[in-house]
A protein has these predicted regions:
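Mid-domain alpha/beta scaffold segments of enzyme catalytic cores
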Residues: 1-248
Length: 248
């Protein structure tokens, strides 16, 4: 899954999905930290929404765009986009997602009350609800997401602390999705998840970017190739076979 965080990145994600059809798929949307682009876009917010609509309709019809996002709220980084701007354009994009009938690829940081309030008004209009990715919330917040029939995405950032681990332990397997969020959210030796990786199969060797070759990873960058370790840690945390995590 190649994620769009604004119009330009969404177009690039669709281009990658087209070039690697059947292997890569795209999301289309504007990330909350980029939502101020609606007010600076030539022609204003309505023009940007129209451009998003055109892109998502054509790419969905071609089988390349499979979700609307990454959209949501991020109150940890209000210095990037003010709260009221985030709220306004999260709601506008939810309306567009309902119009084009794509499941949601969602982002939420320190904004659970507003996030859930806006979602509750639109989710009944989406048969395929979506995913709250890179989940780092509380057990209570996770349960509310599950009650809303949303899936919960887990990556390295979801496994940093013992509290995070306990949340993951309680996510119903049928509502769990594994992800890397590369190039970010790598699993680190300092994280609470590290002890669950002691007997994990090794990942491909990581080298400096200028020494990269096919089959290797780039040092200091999280990559999709690291997803087996996410699945392995979750399996150990839940005390279930790793195959059950992957098949869920």
């Amino acid at each position: 899954m190649v994620t769009g965080s604004d119009l330009k990145e969404s177009q690039h994600a669709v281009d990658i999905a087209r070039e690697h059809s059947g292997l890569c798929y795209a999301t289309v949307g504007v990330h909350p930290c980029s939502a101020k682009q609606f007010d600076t876009y030539p022609g204003g917010a309505s023009a940007l929404l129209s451009a998003l609509r055109d892109l998502v309709q054509t790419s969905k019809a071609a089988g390349h765009a499979v979700a609307f996002g990454e959209i949501g709220l991020d109150y940890d980084r209000l210095f990037l986009t003010p709260k009221e701007t985030q709220l306004k354009y999260f709601e506008a994009q939810l309306e567009l997602a309902v119009e084009v009938q794509l499941p949601l690829f969602l982002h939420s940081r320190a904004a659970s009350e507003d996030f859930e309030r806006l979602l509750a008004a639109k989710l009944p209009l989406l048969p395929k609800k979506g995913l709250v990715h890179s989940f780092t919330g509380t057990v209570e917040e996770m349960r509310r997401m599950v009650d809303m029939q949303l899936d919960v995405g887990v990556n390295g950032c979801s496994l940093k602390t013992e509290d995070n681990v306990e949340v993951v332990r309680q996510i119903p397997v049928e509502r769990l999705q594994i992800e890397t969020d590369g190039p970010w959210c790598e699993m680190r030796p300092s994280h609470a998840s590290a002890k669950y990786l002691k007997d994990a199969p090794p990942l491909p060797k990581a080298v400096k970017k200028e020494k990269w070759a096919q089959g290797l990873m780039v040092k200091g960058r999280n990559e999709p190739a690291a997803i087996p370790h996410v699945a392995w840690a979750i399996a150990k945390i839940k005390d279930i076979p790793v195959e059950d995590v992957c098949e869920a």
